[in-house]
């Protein structure tokens, strides 16, 4: 397995690439890179979002290295440089979020704890934030965690959640869970143009990621499948059930995007208010991908990181 650089998006200095193996022998692309300061403050593990790939976070990893942290990142199964799940590798597919839990375990046990110094911190974005919250109710890897624009609940548009779940569950039960959800297509979202972009207002960083994907189309993932939606809603239920029954094993800072159009910010506030040790801050001018936003937004994000993690 390898990483893919472009002239304006170089891998972090000292990067090492790994193929982590899950218990069911899935290959998960992972990487680590050392701190750029004389003394290390620990390691930050980045958990990226649905359809993401490690290369999109090179810049943020460099920011963290310069602050004295080792960094680690990986791609979830079915996306980026990790092993795909279907014959059509472009489908954003998962059967259960327990599979994502296993990806994280494989990376932590097989890569991070063997190659990077503690204490360990985590930044989870969107779907990665959701999986991180799942992990924090079960595991004790991380001293502190930050989740950006977490997928605590979807915006369902005109469909009530119960109707969306019923239709997706029935479609999956009849053997069509591999099909794309209505309105979603095979090409990766990065190829759909920048106009009315719901993810970032930064055209330069968007174009940088488009170039990476144009040169390495194997990293791309298209729309999600019916099975993905079923698994996601079931994981929402599991997460909220745990919220009522127990706290998390690490303190968490939720960073929300003030101009969010993808996930449900109100659900994140409800989650935080019911869960001890969870704080919330909003970056008002940010769209969904906070770490890939314009310089002003990224400066605010890094200021929150510096204040919270140090």
Feature names for model-found ranges:
Residues 54, 61-87:
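Conserved alpha/beta-hydrolase
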Residues 248, 254-256, 260:
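Short beta-strand/loop motif that positions the catalytic acidic residue
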Residues 47-52:
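Active-site glycine-rich loops that stabilize anionic/oxyanionic intermediates
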Residues 127, 132-220:
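Alpha/beta-hydrolase-fold enzymes
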Residues 250, 264-273:
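Short alpha-helix in the alpha/beta-hydrolase fold that links the catalytic acid
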Residues 92-112:
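Alpha/beta-hydrolase active-site loop
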Residues 278-310:
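Catalytic active-site module of serine/aspartate enzymes centered on a nucleophile-bearing elbow/loop
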Residues 1-21, 26-36:
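An N-terminal hydrophobic leader/cap segment in hydrolases
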């Amino acid at each position: 397995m390898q990483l893919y650089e472009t002239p304006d998006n170089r891998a972090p200095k000292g990067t090492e690439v790994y193929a982590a193996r899950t218990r069911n022998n899935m290959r998960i692309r992972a990487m680590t890179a050392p701190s750029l300061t004389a003394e290390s403050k620990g390691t930050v593990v980045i958990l990226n979002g649905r359809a993401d790939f490690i290369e999109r976070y090179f810049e943020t990893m460099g920011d963290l290295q310069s602050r004295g942290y080792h960094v680690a990142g990986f791609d979830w199964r079915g996306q980026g440089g990790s092993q795909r799940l279907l014959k059509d590798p472009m489908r954003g597919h998962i059967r259960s979020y327990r599979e994502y839990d296993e990806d994280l375990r494989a990376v932590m046990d097989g890569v991070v704890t063997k190659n990077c110094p503690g204490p360990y911190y985590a930044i989870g974005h969107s779907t990665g934030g959701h999986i991180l919250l799942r992990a924090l109710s079960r595991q004790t890897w991380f001293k502190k965690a930050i989740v950006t624009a977490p997928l605590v609940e979807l915006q369902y548009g005109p469909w009530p959640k119960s109707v969306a779940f019923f239709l997706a569950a029935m479609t999956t039960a009849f053997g069509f869970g591999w099909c794309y959800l209505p309105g979603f297509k095979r090409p990766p979202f990065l190829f759909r143009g920048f106009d009315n972009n719901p993810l970032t207002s930064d055209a330069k960083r968007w174009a940088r990621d488009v170039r990476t994907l144009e040169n390495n189309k194997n990293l791309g993932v298209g729309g999600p499948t019916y099975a993905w939606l079923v698994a996601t809603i079931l994981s929402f239920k599991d997460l909220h059930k745990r919220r009522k029954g127990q706290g998390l094993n690490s303190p968490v800072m939720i960073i929300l995007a003030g101009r969010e159009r993808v996930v449900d910010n109100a659900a994140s506030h409800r989650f935080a208010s019911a869960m001890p040790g969870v704080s919330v801050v909003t970056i008002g001018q940010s769209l969904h991908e906070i770490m890939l936003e314009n310089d002003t937004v990224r400066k605010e994000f890094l200021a929150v990181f510096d204040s919270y993690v140090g």
